[in-house]
Regions:
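TRNA-recognition modules of translation machinery and tRNA-sensing kinases, especially anticodon-binding
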Residues: 1-233
C-alpha cells in the first residue's frame, strides 16, 4: 500500500495515538488548518481503511506492508538528537500491519512473525542488533506486548531503536469498530504492527557499521547485486 499521510483525528484516537503516559499528545502531531493531521506512521491510515467494516473469517489474516511519509514534531525536543539525521521531523517508513482473528495465540504467532521479518532485514543489512522486550511501564496505550529492535550505533557506543513491534488484541478494533463474522457471531479482530524500514534513521547504523578508514562503504552481500560492486566511495 501507498498509505496517505493525512489522517483524521478519530483514526489517531482509534489507534491509541493520543493518551497514555508513553504516547504522543496532540501537540506532538502536525495539524492542518482543516483539522486534518499529518500521521507519524502508516498504521493509522491502514487501520482507518477498515474502520466500521465487517469482514469474514476466511479473509484473515490481513497482511499489509504500507509505505508513507511520516511526520513527528518531537524531533530534537528537549535537546535530544538535535543534530544529524537520527531523529527528524519528516521521514519515510514501511510499516507492517496485521489484522487477525480474535485469538491470543494467533496474535502471539503473528507478533513473532512481524519481529522475525524485521530481524531478517537487519541481518541482510549486516547491522548488529538486539531485541528488547519492553516492560509494562514502557508500553503505549492499548499495547499488550512490545518488542523494540535496536541497531548498534558505533559513534554513540550504544544500541538505538530502529523498529517497534506491538500487538493490541482488540483495543484498536473496538475503537474503530472493525469486526468479522465467526459463525453467527460478530467479533472484534486483533491488530498488530511493526516497522519494516524507516529512513533516514537506518542509514545512521548502515553507514557507521560499514564505513572503512578511507571513507569507502562496504556493501552487504544482499545488496551487492543492485550495486554490482562490493563497496562504494
Amino acid at each position: 500500500f501507498m498509505a496517505p499521510a493525512l489522517v483524521r483525528r478519530e483514526n489517531l484516537v482509534g489507534t491509541g495515538w493520543f493518551g497514555g503516559p508513553n504516547n504522543p499528545t496532540e501537540e506532538d502531531v502536525y495539524k492542518t488548518q482543516d483539522d486534518i493531521y499529518l500521521s507519524g506512521t502508516a498504521e493509522v491510515s491502514m487501520m482507518g481503511y477498515h474502520r466500521d467494516e465487517i469482514m469474514n473469517t476466511d479473509e484473515f489474516p490481513k497482511l499489509y506492508a504500507a509505505f508513507s511519509p511520516c511526520y513527528r514534531r518531537e524531533a530534537g525536543s528537549h535537546g535530544k538528537d538535535t543534530k544529524g539525521i537520527f531523529r527528524v521531523h519528516e521521514f519515510f517508513k514501511v510499516e507492517q500491519v496485521i489484522l487477525c482473528r480474535a485469538d491470543h495465540q494467533e496474535s502471539v504467532k503473528w507478533h513473532e512473525e512481524l519481529t522475525k521479518n524485521s530481524e531478517e532485514i537487519m541481518q541482510m543489512l549486516e547491522i548488529p542488533y538486539r531485541v528488547v522486550l519492553n516492560c509494562g511501564g514502557d508500553l503505549g496505550l492499548g499495547q499488550v506486548k512490545k518488542y523494540d529492535i535496536e541497531g548498534w550505533l558505533p559513534s554513540e557506543n550504544k544500541y538505538r531503536e530502529t523498529h517497534s513491534a506491538s500487538y493490541f488484541h482488540d483495543f484498536q478494533t473496538r475503537r474503530l469498530n472493525i469486526k468479522y463474522r465467526d459463525g453467527d457471531n460478530l467479533k472484534f479482530a486483533h491488530s498488530l504492527n511493526n516497522t519494516a524500514m524507516a529512513t533516514p534513521r537506518i542509514l545512521c547504523m548502515f553507514l557507521e557499521n560499514h564505513q572503512n578508514p578511507d571513507s569507502s562503504i562496504n556493501i552487504p552481500k544482499a545488496l551487492q547485486k543492485f550495486f554490482e560492486k562490493e563497496k562504494i566511495g
